[in-house]
């Protein structure tokens, strides 16, 4: 967790060993919801490296493999002899059992979905919980014999060993998934392991996170200056607010207004963010430049590349100006702040917290002579934690709870060429959708609601006494926790009716409103 030169973190650490299939991130989130810091590591990490992180506990995640299959991931040698409390979940439970001399086999009795389990209420994991409870299973293999010294603490109709423990060695295992919401006492099981078996302290709170990060940022940046590119999104805003609290006016934020934002967002960045943080802000009006570069382009990937290229060039020039101005005052600008989140770190294979900017995927392509050291104050946080940190820092709710918005902006929500006229049409429709969702109290229930203009499609309609040929608008409301998967949101019909009536009456050239009811997968959240 530490940055070179920064004070050691005061948080207890739980390592989640990732055996695949997206289970690890969910487990890590659930541990943090218990106010304990968690970090995901691969099963290939040597035990010595794990112990160097000073974990209070280790959790072995589920995974799609069979423990006895060739090439199946295993626990690193010596893991179960470290004395660190360990909880194995599903596949991790089976790895623990097999490694320590138990038996895992395919019994022919698989369990998928909700299952009733009978537990030993005098065991550490299940004390004070009902003897019979509902859990979520997802396994074909099963532990048929526990290792020596272990006690069976849970059974189902098809799994005679659904949980086990060796309390003297602080080793625990469950075949079910305590991290999923369908396991009715899953949080309690995790809390019993974290607080009682491992002695973890519930100190991973927003106040403590902010204090910890501010201290580490100050230690990293010292007396130097930093710059941050604001996109209008919550990640860059919270990252900038954290750094600004740490180093004050030695941070300069750059906001490139490419003209592709939604209604009122540019003004929100320029006014609300500065008012809330007092940060120094350099605004670059590049709307004409971006529209000129996008003229005649309809291919979505080409749009993305053009926008990325132009953004880099504009940001580069702004950065040069800031560096030059600082140089005149003998104050070097050595650091670039980015809003990288923990899922980005996990999916890219990790990182050491500081790297040269040209190697980072978020801002790749900056020229070689613009050398910065990265400051990534959010790289240990999930999205929901970032929002709570933003609230703790006093950022406006409209900014903190803003729906995710793509970097290329409205350009990839216009199916067809991007023009100033089409942007105005889409902005007006999008503003109505956001206003009505807010009025209905659905802001936080919906992950995001892209509004898509089918600019190259003409739809026949009747408005007034005449026939019209306008553009269709597509509403794409979805629910999600992390955008990896999503379901279409069941927005009440009366809200949809109000949105449709307002758009077709108030927005010129729109005569049809449609609803996208595709989940992800198979469809992505954005259309382009």
Curated annotation (Swiss-Prot):
Residues 204-402 form the GMPS ATP-PPase domain. GO terms for molecular function: ATP binding; GMP synthase activity. InterPro entries: Class_I_gatase-like, GATASE, GMP_synth_C, GMP_synth_GATase, GMP_synthase, GMPS_ATP_PPase_dom, NAD/GMP_synthase, Rossmann-like_a/b/a_fold. It comes from the Bacteria. Keywords: ATP-binding, Glutamine amidotransferase, GMP biosynthesis, Ligase, Nucleotide-binding, Purine biosynthesis. Pfam families: GATase, GMP_synt_C, NAD_synthase. Pathway: Purine metabolism; GMP biosynthesis; GMP from XMP (L-Gln route): step 1/1. Disulfide bonds: none annotated. ATP binds at residues 231-237. It catalyses: XMP + L-glutamine + ATP + H2O = GMP + L-glutamate + AMP + diphosphate + 2 H(+). It is an enzyme of class 6 (ligase). Residues 13-203 form the Glutamine amidotransferase type-1 domain. Its EC number is 6.3.5.2. One of its GO terms (cellular component) is cytosol. The active site is at 90 (nucleophile), 177, 179. PROSITE patterns: GATASE_TYPE_1 (PS51273), GMPS_ATP_PPASE (PS51553). NCBIfam families: guaA_Cterm, guaA_Nterm, PRK00074.1. Homodimer. Catalyzes the synthesis of GMP from XMP. This is GMP synthase [glutamine-hydrolyzing]. It comes from Thermobifida fusca (strain YX).
């Amino acid at each position: 967790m530490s940055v070179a030169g920064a004070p050691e973190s005061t948080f207890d650490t739980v390592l989640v060993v990732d055996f695949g299939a997206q289970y690890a991130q969910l487990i890590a989130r659930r541990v943090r919801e218990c106010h304990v810091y968690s970090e995901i590591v691969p099963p290939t990490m040597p035990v010595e490296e794990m112990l160097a992180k000073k974990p209070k506990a280790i959790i072995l995640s589920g995974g799609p493999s069979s423990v006895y299959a060739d090439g199946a991931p295993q626990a690193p040698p010596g893991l179960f002899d470290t004395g660190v409390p360990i909880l194995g979940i599903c596949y991790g439970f089976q790895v623990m059992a097999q490694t320590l001399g138990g038996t895992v086999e395919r019994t022919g009795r698989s369990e998928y979905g909700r299952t009733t389990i009978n537990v030993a209420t005098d065991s550490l994991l299940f004390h004070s919980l009902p003897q019979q409870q509902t859990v979520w299973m997802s396994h074909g293999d099963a532990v048929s014999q526990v290792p020596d010294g272990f006690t069976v603490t849970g059974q189902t109709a098809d799994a005679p060993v659904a949980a086990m423990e060796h309390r003297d060695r602080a080793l625990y295992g469950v075949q079910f998934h305590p991290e999923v919401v369908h396991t009715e006492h899953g949080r309690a099981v995790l809390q019993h392991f974290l607080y009682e078996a491992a002695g973890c302290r519930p100190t991973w709170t927003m106040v403590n996170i902010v204090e910890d990060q501010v201290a580490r940022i100050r230690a990293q940046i010292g007396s130097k200056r930093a710059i941050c590119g604001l996109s209008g999104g919550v990640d860059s805003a919270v990252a900038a607010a954290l750094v600004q609290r740490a180093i004050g006016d030695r941070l300069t934020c750059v906001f490139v207004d490419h003209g592709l934002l939604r209604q009122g967002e540019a003004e929100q960045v320029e006014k609300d963010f500065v008012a809330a943080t007092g940060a120094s802000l350099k605004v670059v009006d590049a709307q004409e430049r971006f529209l000129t570069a996008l003229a005649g382009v309809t291919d979505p990937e080409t749009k993305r590349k053009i926008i990325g290229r132009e953004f880099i060039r504009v940001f580069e020039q702004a950065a040069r100006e800031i560096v030059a101005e600082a140089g005149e005052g003998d104050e070097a600008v050595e650091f670039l702040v980015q809003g990288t989140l923990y899922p980005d770190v996990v999916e890219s294979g990790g990182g050491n917290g500081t790297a040269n900017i040209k190697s980072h995927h978020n801002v790749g392509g900056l020229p070689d002579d613009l050398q910065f050291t990265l400051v990534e104050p959010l790289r240990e946080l999930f999205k929901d934690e970032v929002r709570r940190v933003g609230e703790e820092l006093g950022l406006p709710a409209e900014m903190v709870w803003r729906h995710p918005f793509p970097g290329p902006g409205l350009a990839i929500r216009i199916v067809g060429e991007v023009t100033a006229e089409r942007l105005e049409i889409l902005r007006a429709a999008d503003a109505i959708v956001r206003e009505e969702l807010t009025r209905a109290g659905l802001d936080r229930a919906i992950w995001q609601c892209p509004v898509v203009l089918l600019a190259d499609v003409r739809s026949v309609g009747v408005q007034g006494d005449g026939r019209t040929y306008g553009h269709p608008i597509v509403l794409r409301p979805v629910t999600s926790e992390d955008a990896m998967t999503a379901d279409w949101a069941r927005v009440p019909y009366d809200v949809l009716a109000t949105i449709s009536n307002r758009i077709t009456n108030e927005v010129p050239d729109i005569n049809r409103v449609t609803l996208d009811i595709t989940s992800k997968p198979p469809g992505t959240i954005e259309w382009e």
